[in-house]
Amino acid sequence: GNEIFSDKIGLLIARNLSKTHKNSKFIVDVKSTGLYSNDKILKNNQCQTIYWKTGHSHIKRKVHSEKALAGFEKSGHFFFNKPLGYGYDDGINSAIQVCRLLNSDDRKISEIMNELPKTFQSPTMAPFCKDNEKYEVVNQLVKEIEDIKKNKTIIDQQEITEIITVNGVRFSFDDGSWGLIRASSNKPSLVVVTESPTSDERKKKIFEFIDELLPVS
């Protein structure tokens, strides 16, 4: 069988929940797939997705402060607020939600997954950066990417259309492709992720753009 990563399991759960909980909010971390932003089922059910800081405690607090229905972290930490749960990291509830998803649909999960647009996502990469330098390095990269957006610089034939700076910098393009650079919270490195719904080559081009920005150690 094929491996399904946690961010896409979260999206399947969110889509299913949105049918009975319209106008809900969902919190996801900045490493998660960009499919949440443009998902037709979530949009049709007037649901909002907020990208937030990576980390168990950050997602938990944001779910509480936003009164979100649920929060999904790519690492697999899932949180469900009332009336589904009590807002803490809940593996049993997560399994229940997957079972409910399957119970409401006669298809196999592989067939349900095939409804999602195909994306090409890099593994989470961790270029070395000293602990006492990594946050300043990221701050500088945020400024550089903000300038690139402001100046409408073309990257692989597209401009950056959106920037999220709640946790490093996540920048997106019109075609739904995006890249992320943030400081690791628990080791001397940066965190780099790229994703494209267009092609594997596009994903690689965004990584090459990031690689050129990174300072040489």
Give the positions of each predicted feature.
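Phosphate-binding and adjacent anionic-ligand microenvironments
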Residues: 20-193, 199-217
